[in-house]
Amino acid sequence: MCQAVERLYSLGHRNIAFVNSNIEYNFAHLRLQGYLKGLKKLGLKQNDNMVLNGVMTTKEGENATRKLLHESFPPTAILYATDVAALGAYKVASDLGLQIGKELSIISYDGVPEGAFANPPLTTFKIDTKKAGEQLAALLIKRVNGEAVELLRETDPAILYPGEADGSPTVSSKELSCLLEKAKIVKT
């Protein structure tokens, strides 16, 4: 996630939110730490309102996106710990008339196939699942053979698969707030 924060920063984003999975999972803890490390490295202020934990489904991703966009200074970019949660942002953007990759940038993690078919295609990080499977199989074989097996704590760097869901912001947080206010008035 540190690399994702750096990417968004290089595109011009300064208000970057993070939608995390259940913090009890090791991967979620590591992704949160990466997000926070990225903010710190770039001198961006950490805002607790810009971090939501416990988001596991597309519907929860949708709700989290709505909550973040209702902040007085909404994020121009949102990182998601999982692609499944990120896909919920697409419905919200459509409902509010926002163009993903322009008024709202999204980067997530997992590389699920559905992300490639989203409109625009999701920008995502993923790991080499073949290598991860080989590591797990080697551990299982050791275990079956009665060898002592340490817990697998090895992590490999994720690879960015650029889609079109992230781009330079076309509006500031303040301008985005005004757009969202207008969208709310039109909907009622």
Regions found by a protein language model. Give the residues of each.
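Short hydrophobic beta-strand segments
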Residues: 13-19
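Short polybasic/polar patches that bind polyanions
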Residues: 9, 40, 94
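Non-catalytic positions within long, well-ordered alpha-helices that form the structural scaffold/packing
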Residues: 9-12, 69
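Carboxylate-rich, polar loop motifs that coordinate divalent cations or form catalytic acidic clusters
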Residues: 6
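Conserved H-loop
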Residues: 14, 45-47, 99
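ATP/adenylate-binding site constellation spanning eukaryotic-like Ser/Thr protein kinases
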Residues: 13, 32, 119
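Hinge/beta->alpha junction and helix N-cap segments in small-molecule ligand-binding domains
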Residues: 1-3, 19-64, 79-87, 109-111, ...
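Flexible loop/turn connectors
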Residues: 64-187
